[in-house]
Amino acid sequence: MTSPLMNESYRKNLPGTALDYFDTREAVDAIQPGAYATLPYTSRVLAENLVRRCDPAALEASLRQLIERRQDLDFPWFPARVVCHDILGQTALVDLAGLRDAIADAGGDPAQINPVVPTQLIVDHSLAVEHPGFDKAAFERNRAVEDRRNEDRFHFINWTRKAFKNVDVIPPGNGIMHQINLEKMSPVVQVRDGVAFPDTCVGTDSHTPHVDALGVIAIGVGGLEAESVMLGRASWMRLPDIIGVELTGRPQPGITCTDIVLALTEFLRAARVVGAWIEFFGEGASALSIGDRATISNMTPEFGATAAMFSIDQQTLDYLRLTGREEAQVQLVETYAKAAGLWADDLAQVQYERVLQFDLSSVVRNMAGPSNPHKRVATSELAARGIADEGKLASGKLEQADGLMPDGAVIIAAITSCTNTSNPRNVIGAALLARNANRAGLTRKPWVKSSLAPGSKAVQLYLEEAGLLGELEQLGFGIVGFACTTCNGMSGALDPVIQQEIIDRDLYATAVLSGNRNFDGRIHPYAKQAFLASPALVVAYAIAGTVRFDIEKDALGVDAQGNPITLKDLWPSDEEIDAVVKASVKPEQFRKVYDPMFTFKVEHGAPISPLYAWRPQSTYIRRPPYWEGALAGARDLSGMRPLAVLGDNITTDHLSPSNAILASSAAGEYLAKMGLPEEDFNSYATHRGDHLTAQRATFANPKLINEMAVVDGAVKQGSLARVEPEGQVMRMWEAIETYMLRRQPLIIIAGADYGQGSSRDWAAKGVRLAGVEAIAAEGFERIHRTNLIGMGVLPLEFKPGVTRLTLGIDGTETFDVTGARLPRAELTLVIHRRDGSQLMVPVTCRLDTAEEVSIYEAGGVLQRFAQDFLEASQGA
């Protein structure tokens, strides 16, 4: 299935060019006349991939799955690219470096282990906002801290750039992978060996669908699946539900696309689109700019979906020109899209499994919070929802008069994330609001740590062109870096005085950010909750200083005549925003940023070793253990004890947090023993190349609720577990160490939507290294389920209506799993009670494909790689 260009009979000249393409319409209609016209956009792209890459013997059967909408069979997909950020991308390359060692140990040639598919690694997850936006040297200082803390990691990444073929690296300080993908890396239509075809990619981040806005299928996957694709293997899938979402109407004046996407997130969550591929269409969709479309597509994982596509149209071409793409490439996109039936006008007869309607004119000004992206709250309802509170606001003013912070203090206000900074309208809107606030004499509250972290250097250029960067800087929103920063939990340290006051007074402190996630504990350990909002609202909340403030009604200050100044007095008109965007955002800005960034130098120096020289004292990069000992041995699915019994909506932030490492944590204690000063502990995310540090992050979230951790008759929140049979509650890491010493196989019992959130492979690696053999839950998030399989952990799904509560599981039990492990087979979870009784519970084996069964039985993706490579080498 891996040989390229398999079905030459469908290879045709692309009209008006010297290139060829594969005529997918002919291939599909040869099976069922007229079928191509009814296929959704995504099915057409998947069909082209099959026609171009699939074994001819399997082509008709695979295409029939798309035509007949069959969801019971597997078919291969070969993405054109892999895009990575430096956390999961680095851990993937650490795994490949470890695989090279394993191959060398077995007598193979390690230099033969290379990515086959072009892989782009962007260093964007390492920068913490240690110096805020009101520090004029914040950018340089934050970059210096980033380089110092991450020397080990960057040394390894630099080695990979030279040691591996097909790996391009964008160094730190240049932007966010998704925004760079949107503005530069995606050509929309690829050309290789004289053949034009749709650009597609997988990315090691759940927000990879950001570039779906361009009509590019881009799917977020875990690091393990990305490794598989890198090495040239097909990504096997079953056809998902493809749901059409018709966007009608036009947004009301003053409504941003952030407001729209937060409303859409609530709407689509309620419509249960989990795992589906969404296609937006209709007059409302056609009128949205690519910036607005990207804001929507970015939050695909928050919808619960896999992809959120827009088709190619004039907006696409205009955006490609705006961002400095070559005119020949823009014309190729138009020519190919119209020839291949990917142009928006060619989709009138598409048939979807479901069609939903969403009226853009119904959207009001929104936020999301205080702890989930789909928990929308209209700003007009803040008081009714108990967030804005007149009494607490008055008390807070008295506290401020005494030099104290108010209840509900906004301690972090961050314009952050590709969700919004890739949308010029949102950035310019915030800057104009800042200008108006400055003119009115308003200022940021002194306890607010404010920051601006664009996902692209082009943002700085167009803000300067508009004369607005200084307006943001005046309010404390200077540029602190070009990276993910606060959105990824890298908000940096608070002022020590402010932090101590929060601790001493047990203050309810919050964050407001223009990001895409606000799970408890994600943004900062001392921000008890967080709200998502448009960049303009972030600026407004920095002025207000507290979430007890009714942002629509309360006065942000007074003018020279003593008249109250409210949000509507500061909010810029849509006409002004559009005029500034049109005058200030220019193609030459993008060319100035990206032309030098993507001119990769060929270095002719001393040959570099194919094996990495591991540093024994490193706490960032360490040879992985996945080919050694029990991890490479037989599975033991009997006598398992529960490590945790969990409720619904357990996120990968619960399973393996990304934010700052505290000195009191297990990881912090380990780093101190290794000689690191506390100020250089960095984040959990940055240490994921060292399993000895990273495994100590397993369930290290202080917001974890493990129902086994009962103290004085009540479940205690925290990184806690109960060791059985003693019944002793202790810190999670100590419990894991205890079970590891006993060689005790473990299981996790959980509720619905287990593993939602970031595509974090360490959420699976951590539990596997702890000795977890299986996880039984009411449901799994897609990426996390594949990561579990990639690590050799068996996902089991309870039947509808069966839960840990109906089964009365309290953690004293032991568990066996019996039955033949086949795709979606019914297995039996045998529960052994402490009183000697047994309960036989049917569960669904969530190894969904034959390929997943094969990976699991091999012990995981990495073990499977080694086996296949050595077998192929011996047979050569």
Where are these regions (language model features)?
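Fe-S-dependent hydro-lyases/dehydratases of central metabolism
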Residues: M1-A876
